[in-house]
Amino acid sequence: MSTLEVKDLHVSVEDKEILKGINLTVNTGEIHALMGPNGNGKSTLLMAIMGHPTYHVTQGSITLDGKDVLAMSVDERSKAGIFLALQYPAEINGVTNSDFLKAAVNAHRETPISLFKFIRELDTAIEDLKLKGEIAHRFVNEGFSGGEKKRNEIVQMKLLKPAIALLDEIDSGLDVDAIKIVADNILQLQEESPMGLMIVSHYDRFYQLVKPTFAHVMVNGQIIAEGDQQLVEKIDSEGYEWLLKEKNIILESEKVEKKISLGSCANNPRGNK
């Protein structure tokens, strides 16, 4: 069993504090829904856990099974069992998908995987995600549709079998059938090789399919509410306004907008900075 612990995490980007004291624990077998309005720190949290250099941890800790994640490089975090599926997967020209995935698998093993076993596992994962076999021989994400990119992230996750998986809007841009395919494969892997999951999504339908164990709502870089599937359903039906009123919270983006008066616009009619 693995445990990812985030304690009092503060993260800044270009001297602007984005996360302001996040506390979160994810255990093997759990699925955590990370919710909140756009621009309130959800993706920042995932990026900080994975070690993206743009996101600077200024306070707090991240541990995986008691080991200091912040002391690890991105590669070391990956080898330790942390996986991040990006919202916008990058294209890698000149590197075939199969070569990239084989290298990723071998980086997590003490001895290289046999070619026969790798091909068998890759073919199975591609088939499970309802992708065409030719995708293995194309350059990574080059010319892939948005849906192919997202499903290819799940192919990689199935091959790596991480301890902790962070999925950043893995369902965005997918049609109804593709969303179900992705959700089914997440649950299948969870059953075959249990992991802890943290999933960012704006769609209740996706959460209905993966059935999160816990739900967390992030606003202004803080977790303001926690619950389970019932919280997900209430937000889907009523939005976030009731929660903001209950907690007496104003979105920081709205605070900025209120500072822009008619007078300031009149003094700057062309919008010059």
Q: Model regions: which residues?
A:
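Conserved structural motif at the start of ABC-family nucleotide-binding domains
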Residues: L4-V6, L19-G21, V26
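Short coil-to-beta microelement around the adenine-binding A-loop and adjacent beta1/P-loop entry
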Residues: K16-E17, E76
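The feature captures the beta-strand-to-loop junction immediately N-terminal to the Walker
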Residues: M35-P37
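Helix-to-loop junction immediately C-terminal to a conserved catalytic motif
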Residues: M50
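ABC ATPase NBD Q-loop/coupling interface
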Residues: S61-R77, N141
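ABC-family P-loop ATPase nucleotide-binding domains
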Residues: A90-A163
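Walker B catalytic motif
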Residues: E169-I170, D177
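Conserved beta-strand-loop-alpha-helix hinge in the C-terminal portion
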Residues: M218, Q222-K245
